């Protein structure tokens, strides 16, 4: 049986940069901010220390979450016109006393997004969620990193 070696910091850093490229493709501002934060974190902990393997593991887990679970929305170009029509309907409803909310127009406009779902995103169906863990008990460790959580029983 071959022993698996932990990735070195450079491998983890490259994996994290690839994950940011996949997750934030087309959004230069967010991509730049994510990469700057990754660089800052790796630069702050440049020297090898006792916690280096834990930090490498954290970077790998962060990259995996970015790659498989982060979906960005893009504002649909025609959303403004439909939001305007929707707003005029709301004004009529408010006048008649049928509606009392305040930021409905803005919420409607903000809700009109197209999601960027790429091939790496985890997909599941509701049946797998409903049946998962029905007969299992899981202890959740509060205040610990994801890699330190243990399931029991």
Swiss-Prot record:
One of its GO terms (molecular function) is protein folding chaperone. Assembly factor required for Rieske Fe-S protein RIP1 incorporation into the cytochrome b-c1 (CIII) complex. Functions as a chaperone, binding to this subunit within the mitochondrial matrix and stabilizing it prior to its translocation and insertion into the late CIII dimeric intermediate within the mitochondrial inner membrane. Modulates the mitochondrial matrix zinc pool. Keywords: Chaperone, Mitochondrion, Transit peptide. Interacts with RIP1. It is found in: Mitochondrion matrix. This is Mitochondrial zinc maintenance protein 1, mitochondrial. It comes from the Eukaryota. One of its GO terms (biological process) is mitochondrial respiratory chain complex III assembly. GO terms for cellular component: mitochondrial matrix. Residues 1-56 form a transit peptide. It comes from Ajellomyces capsulatus (strain H143) (Darling's disease fungus). Belongs to the complex I LYR family. MZM1 subfamily.
């Amino acid at each position: 049986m071959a022993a698996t070696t932990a990735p070195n910091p450079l491998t983890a850093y490259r994996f994290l940069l690839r994950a940011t490229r996949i997750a934030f493709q087309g959004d230069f501002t967010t991509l730049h901010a994510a990469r700057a934060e990754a660089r800052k974190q790796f630069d702050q902990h440049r020297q090898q220390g006792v916690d280096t393997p834990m930090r490498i593991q954290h970077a790998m887990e962060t990259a995996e979450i970015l790659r498989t679970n982060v979906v960005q929305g893009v504002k649909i170009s025609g959303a403004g016109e439909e939001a305007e029509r929707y707003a005029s309907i709301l004004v009529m409803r408010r006048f008649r006393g049928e509606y009392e909310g305040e930021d409905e127009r803005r919420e409607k406009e903000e809700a009109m997004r197209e999601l960027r779902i790429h091939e790496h995103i985890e997909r599941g169906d509701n049946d797998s969620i409903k049946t998962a863990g029905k007969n299992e008990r899981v202890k959740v460790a509060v205040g610990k990193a994801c890699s330190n959580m243990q399931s029991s029983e």
